[in-house]
Design a protein with these regions (language model features):
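Protein kinase catalytic-loop region centered on the HRD/HxD motif
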Residues: 150-163
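Activation segment signature within eukaryotic-like protein kinase domains
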Residues: 145-146
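Conserved short submotifs of the Hanks-type protein kinase catalytic core
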Residues: 108-122, 126
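Conserved N-lobe loop of protein kinases adjacent to the ATP-binding glycine-rich P-loop
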Residues: 51-60
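AlphaC helix of the eukaryotic protein kinase fold
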Residues: 66-92
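C-terminal lobe helix-coil module of Hanks-type protein kinase domains
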Residues: 210-306
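Activation-segment/catalytic-loop signature of the eukaryotic protein kinase fold
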Residues: 104
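Conserved N-lobe ATP-binding subsite of Hanks-type protein kinase domains
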Residues: 46
Length: 341
């Protein structure tokens, strides 16, 4: 195996067939927001940079959410209600490391979330620039970022009901020109107190493969919680500090040795930092830190990891994770079919 990392994008979600062509530059939404250009394109819609015509000089980021075209009118109505409920919660959030949500609305079967435009570069771009120079990101710098990211996640998870981001990755973390970290892209945020999993699936999407734990596969939203974010956070720090993208959870499920020890890829990583990363990336949620505060204690060297993980066996994983069992069966059958062709 080569010791050079294979540079990959954040493995962005597959763009849904519902996502049509973006609005033309100059389009005005809600008689207030003039779109300048597309700054991102995700699984459920586009993200635009816009000028606020009511407050000259203010720039906004507008997240577009488009429901699947085959949905019944009733499911479309539920999807819109879910969006409005989530957006109203997000608009109440106020934290220095989160962009402020200032408005939300629906127009022509699409929902829009308006938030502050965050200038600067995302951590994926900084990682790629460091790689191009033949360098690795400095651990002290990454831990400085970690302080701010963890503070934002702690704030989200303390809400009532708790708010889980569900798509933490280097590309969704921005560093502003004044050195502040912003956790962006609320497109996959999920509130834990929901009754209709179908609506959640319609609105949310499914995260990003390299940073997504096994319980999040298949849109099984009822089994995700704060520990889902902790896995993604650990995977993000793994990538930032090793310069190697982590193997996705499906690969790790079939091959537990696929995840290489962080210090084997970068000897400058402190032992306690490597320990925290591997703890956060445990396959079973019960084996991970149960809060970001627990994760932070080990990451910053305040405490050692309390308990070792249970022995990881395929049989135990199958018994405890129905989604994983179905996934493993599907992969096995696919391998058999390909062998026979």
């Amino acid at each position: 195996m080569s010791d050079r990392p294979v540079l990959e994008p954040d493995s962005a979600p597959v763009v849904s067939e519902a996502v049509g062509p973006p609005h033309e530059p100059g389009t005005v939404l809600r008689a207030r927001y003039r779109l300048t250009h597309v700054v991102g394109r995700g699984g459920m819609g586009n993200v635009y940079r816009a000028e606020d015509l009511r407050l000259p000089g203010r720039l906004c980021a507008i997240k577009e959410v488009t429901p699947e075209p085959h949905l019944s009118p009733e499911l479309r109505r539920q999807a819109n209600q879910q969006f409005l409920q989530e957006a109203s919660i997000l608009a109440q959030l106020d934290h220095p490391n989160l962009p402020k949500v200032s408005d939300f609305f629906s127009d022509d079967s699409r929902d829009y979330l308006v938030m502050d435009f965050v200038p600067g570069h995302d951590l994926r771009e900084l990682l790629q620039a460091s790689h191009a120079r033949g360098e690795k990101l400095d651990e002290r710098m990454v831990l400085d970022w970690a302080i701010q990211i963890i503070d934002a996640l702690s704030y989200l998870h303390r809400q009532s009901p708790p708010v889980v981001h569900r798509d933490i990755k280097p590309g969704n973390i921005k560093l502003t020109p004044d050195g502040r970290i912003k956790l962006v892209d609320f497109g996959l945020v999920k509130l834990l107190a929901q009754d209709d999993a179908r609506t959640i699936t319609v609105v949310q999407g499914r995260g990003t493969a390299l940073y997504t734990p096994l319980e999040q596969y298949g849109g099984d939203s009822g089994h995700t919680d704060a520990r889902t974010d902790i896995y993604a956070l650990g995977a993000t720090f793994y990538h930032l500090l090793t310069d190697f993208p982590p193997p996705d959870a499906k690969t790790r499920f079939l091959n537990p040795r696929a995840l290489r020890p962080p210090r084997g890829l970068n000897t400058n990583i402190s032992p306690h930092v490597a320990e925290a990363i591997l703890w956060a990336m445990e396959m079973h949620p019960d084996d991970r830190p149960q809060s970001v505060a627990e994760f932070a204690d080990v990451l910053f060297g305040h405490h050692a990891r309390a308990h070792p993980a249970r022995p990881a066996t395929l049989a135990s994983a199958l018994r405890e994770n129905r989604t994983a069992a179905l996934l493993a069966l599907g992969l096995f059958l696919l391998a058999v079919v390909l062998t026979l062709l």
